[in-house]
C-alpha cells in the first residue's frame, strides 16, 4: 500500500489529505489572532491510518464514505426483484459499504496547484456485493477561508 500525503494551502487554510480513503488528516484554521489550530480528529501520521488497529476497527476518521453511507439492514437489498447480498461488517448489517469501502481504498490523486486536489476511484461491478461499475470523483478545493468538497459519481447500472 503506497501512502501519500497531499497539502492544500493558502493564507487562511491548510489541509492535509491522504490518498488512503481520501482522508482529511488535518485541517488548520486561523483564529482572530492568526494562530493556526487543527480542527480534525485523527492520527499524527499517514502511516497510522494503514495499521490494522485503524483498518479493522472502522473509526472512519476524516474518510470518504462509499459506495453507500450508513447501515443496510441484514446486509442485503432488492432492486427490481433481484436481491443483492453485501459484506457484513456491523453485527450482520453492512456499514458504510463494508470492509472494502471507499475509506479503505487507495485513490488516484492529481494536484494541479496548491489549492485544488482531485481524487478518483473506480468501484467495479459486484465489489462488496453492489451492482454496477461506479466511477467516483471527489474535488477538494480552498479559496480564501472556504473549503469545498464536491462529489460526483456515475454508475452503469441502476
Description of each model-found segment:
Residues 1-158:
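Surface-exposed acidic/polar loop and edge beta-strand patches at domain peripheries
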Amino acid at each position: 500500500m503506497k501512502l501519500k500525503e497531499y497539502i492544500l494551502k493558502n493564507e487562511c487554510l491548510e489541509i492535509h489529505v491522504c490518498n488512503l480513503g481520501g482522508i482529511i488528516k488535518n485541517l488548520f484554521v486561523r483564529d482572530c489572532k492568526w494562530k493556526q489550530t487543527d480542527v480534525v480528529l485523527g492520527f499524527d501520521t499517514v502511516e497510522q491510518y494503514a495499521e490494522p488497529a485503524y483498518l479493522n476497527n472502522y473509526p472512519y476518521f476524516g474518510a470518504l464514505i462509499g459506495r453507500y453511507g450508513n447501515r443496510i439492514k441484514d446486509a442485503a437489498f432488492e432492486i427490481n426483484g433481484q436481491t443483492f447480498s453485501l459484506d457484513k461488517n456491523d453485527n450482520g448489517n453492512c456499514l458504510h459499504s463494508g470492509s472494502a469501502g471507499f475509506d479503505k481504498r487507495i485513490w488516484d490523486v492529481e494536484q494541479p496547484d496548491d489549492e485544488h486536489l482531485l481524487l478518483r476511484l473506480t468501484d467495479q461491478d459486484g465489489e462488496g456485493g453492489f451492482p454496477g461499475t461506479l466511477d467516483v470523483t471527489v474535488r477538494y478545493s480552498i479559496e480564501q477561508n472556504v473549503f469545498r468538497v464536491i462529489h460526483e459519481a456515475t454508475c452503469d447500472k441502476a
